[in-house]
Amino acid sequence: MWALAFVLAKIGIFAGVIAGAGGVLALGGYHNGSRAAHTRLLSYSLLGAFIGFHSSLAPVLIQAGQINDAGVMGMFDSDLVLLLRGTPVWESAAFRGAGFALSALLTLSLLRTLRAQRKPPDSVFYRLAFIGQALALGLVAYGFTLSGHVSVLDAWLRAALAFHVAAMAIWLGMLLPLRWCCDDVESGGLGELMRRFGRLGIGLVAALASSGVFMLLNLIDIIELFTTEYGRLILFKLGAFVGLLAIAALNKLRHVPVLHLPGGSRALARSIDRELVVAMALLLVTAVVTTLFGPATH
């Protein structure tokens, strides 16, 4: 029961950071420019912040319930919860929760500003959105380095994990806004938008791959990829990542060049739908492997 609860909380944190980052960053031109599109992106980000905030606090309550051994009601033993102050699970929850709270306050402020203005948002609106979300994402990413087996390792590995989380959140968080663009943006503008994301995606994939390989080489011996449960799950995760790259390459090389043809945008939309399914599988495996398993040497 408690293991499943921890996994579900981790999935909620992943979903929150992905939606929170993707919704705000997609304001940078990945929409049709309408007020409705701005509202939808900010609502997407706000939903992510809401889910992420509550999922970030959940591990503290789950830990208390696990220690108390009194069922679900044991999670709400305030004295025991307060005794967890200063532990890795508490500190991680504090930074993640602060990041998601900042993201929620930011998006609420942006939504209020958007509704109060009759004219399109100016550069200050976008600058505030991007800077605020970058700070929020930094807090959440740092929170990941404070718990788990990486938390006891050197600063370079913890920095690589934070970098990995941030790149993952941006890349996967942009997929749903891109899917919306297939329905809302005319084919000429959609092609330019997708080419621009393709250039951004190269940098994000490079960041994900380099940080992931660095952590992998420092956390596990290569032979353990084939001889341990943790290693085999890592291989499955790598396979899902390669699958995402294959779909992204297919989008770039096959679907984007023919967007001007009849049915071009629908074909791209279906491809992004498949990408979203693979991304969900990747996140599920990541939640399981980072919550329930660990490298044998750490």
Per-region residue spans from a language model:
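Polytopic transmembrane helical bundles with strong interfacial aromatic enrichment
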Residues: 1-298
